[in-house]
């Protein structure tokens, strides 16, 4: 029996992905990325200074850094989400740390030199998978930002060492499914977020049983789905970047 989801996708089918690069003019990397109804603006900015703790830790080495910030705009969800001003909620803090950790795994910081890259991910519309879409879009924005300073970098030592993308997987009505939207996520018996390189290596796996525990077999099935989905996302990133794809 073929399991058909509420939006008519197959169990192993991603939502439709759309990307608009150079969406804004101020940041050297700027990407509007959509997966179904979920929409995130990812920008990458480059500063020629380092955080004080980073500069103090490596006074003799010109080693760069990457950090990330994540926020959901008030109108991105219903009911309205209160705007984060002085203090971020725990969820946003956790997500931006995940985005930062993931994207740092792609960068050779010695090749970058004494620069700080900031990835800003602002959710314009939330329908599930905002953190994973932020990573996938954030990588595209990162590539465009690095391309903007190519003339200041050594051609012998690439700054970006691997591609990464991320996707959610879960179990809905007893069936492992790929790329959950909000309806599915709210009903999921198991919820995983998987970050992988374009070569198929795992960078981070976050998983939770929402009710009863799940078996190793179900875990393997979900990781297989994630591997398939991320391979598709990596191809999409390559097509979106075109000549700016950092790997020849």
Predicted regions and their residues:
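Structured core elements
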Residues: 18-20, 32-34, 41-43, 67, ...
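Conserved phosphate/anionic-ligand binding catalytic regions in large, soluble enzymes, centered on
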Residues: 29-33, 130-137, 141
């Amino acid at each position: 029996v073929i399991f058909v989801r509420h939006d008519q996708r197959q169990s192993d089918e991603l939502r439709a992905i759309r990307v608009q690069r150079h969406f804004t003019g101020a940041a050297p990397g700027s990407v509007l990325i959509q997966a179904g109804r979920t929409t995130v603006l990812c920008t990458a900015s480059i500063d020629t200074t380092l955080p004080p703790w980073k500069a103090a830790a490596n006074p003799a080495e010109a080693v760069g850094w990457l950090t990330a910030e994540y926020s959901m705009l008030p109108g991105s969800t219903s009911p309205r989400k209160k705007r984060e001003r002085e203090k971020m909620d725990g969820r946003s803090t956790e997500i931006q740390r995940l985005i930062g950790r993931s994207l740092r795994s792609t960068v050779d910081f010695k090749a970058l030199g004494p620069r700080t890259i900031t990835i800003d991910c602002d959710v314009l519309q939330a329908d599930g998978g905002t953190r994973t879409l932020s990573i996938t879009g954030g990588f595209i924005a990162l590539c465009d930002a690095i391309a903007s300073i190519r003339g200041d970098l050594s051609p012998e030592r690439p700054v970006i060492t691997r591609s990464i993308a991320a996707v959610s997987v879960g179990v809905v009505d007893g069936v492992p499914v790929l790329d959950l939207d909000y309806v599915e996520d709210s009903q999921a018996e198991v919820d995983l977020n998987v970050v992988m390189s374009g070569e198929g290596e795992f960078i981070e796996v976050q998983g939770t049983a929402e009710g009863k525990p799940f078996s190793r077999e179900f875990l393997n099935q979900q990781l297989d789905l994630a591997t398939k989905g991320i391979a598709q996302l990596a191809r999409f990133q390559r097509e979106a970047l075109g000549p700016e794809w950092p790997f020849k």
